[in-house]
Amino acid sequence: MMAISNAELRERLLFSLPEDARRRTAKLAQLNDRYLPDKEHDQALKAGIATIFEQAAKKPTRGFVEGKIVLVTGESGAGKSKAIRNALAQQKAAMGGDLDHLFVECLAPSPCTSGQLAMAVLDGVSYQLVRELRENVAWRRARDQLKRIKPLAVWIDELQHILDHLQSEAEAVKFLNTVKTHVLMPQWPPVSLVLSGLPVLKQLAAKDRQIQRRVHEVILHPLSFPKDADRVRRNVVGIIKNDVGLKIDAAVVSDEFIARLIHTAAGALGLSIKLVDEAAATAFGNGRDTVTLRDFADAYARETGRPASENPFLVDNWHLVRPWYADAVALAKIQAAAPQEKAA
C-alpha cells in the first residue's frame, strides 16, 4: 500500500467531518499560524533577546566574548514559545539576510536526561543520528557541531523536563558544568542560550554563580483581574473582529465576562487566546455572524468534556468552579518542582 502525503491525509480528514466542524477546523488552522502581539510580553522579550546581540557585537577580549543566557519563565499556557519565536524572528529581520543558521531551536523531550538533551541539540542543528549516543559522546558531538555552525543563540524550550533527571544538588551542578563546557564556549561570535520553561527553572540557574551572572531573566507573569482586563479585552476584540471578521455580543466585552475568561484560562495569556480562538471559530463554523457567550461555553465543553455544571461560561458562581486548565497548570508545576524539592 502506498503511503499518502500529510497534506492529502489532512484533506481526507477534513472531508470526513461535518460541515460546521470542517469550517471550524479550517479557521482554527489559520488562527494557529498567526502570532497575536502582546505589548507587555513582546517588550520584555525584545529587551532580553537584544542582550544576546549586544554581547555578540562587543569587541573580543583575548579572542572571545562570553555568551549570555536569556531565561524565559512562565506558567504552562503563558504563550512562551510563540512569543520567543516572534522575538527571534524580529531580530533576524532587523539584521537582514538569510540568518536561520544563526539560531538553533530545540525541544527538551519528556522525560529528559542530560544525554537526551544533547541529542535534542544535535537534532536542532539537523545532525543525522543513526543510533543513541552515550552522554559524554553526545555532548562532545554537540559542541563540535556548534563550533562548526557558529550560531549566535541556542534556544532550548521546555527545559524543566531535565529536572526529573537531576535528583540531587551534585547532579544539578554537573549538568550546569556540562552546559558551560559544551555550549557556552569561549569563542567569537559567542554562543548564547535562550532557556524557556516553568518558573522552577530559576532555582536551577541559581545553583551556579557563573551561570547566574550571565542570566537576563524574562518573567511572563500570569493575568489577573482587574489589572489585565483591558489587555485581554483588546485580544477578544482583535481576534473576533479583525482575525475572524465577526461581530461581538456586548456581553462578551463586559468586565464580568473578561473576569470569567481570565479565571477559565487560569491566568495564562496563551490559554486565554486559545479560548477566544475556539469560540470565534465555533461561531464561524456554525455560519453565524456574532460571537456570544454561548460560543465560549460550547467551545469549552467540546475541548474539556466538562458538564454544564462545571463550565465557567455557564454557571452563575463561575469563580467557584475550578477550570480544567487550572488542573493542567497545577500538575505541570508539581511535576517540575518535585525533583528540586528532593534535591534540596
Positions of PLM-derived features:
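AAA+/P-loop NTPase substrate/partner-engagement loops
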Residues: 93-122
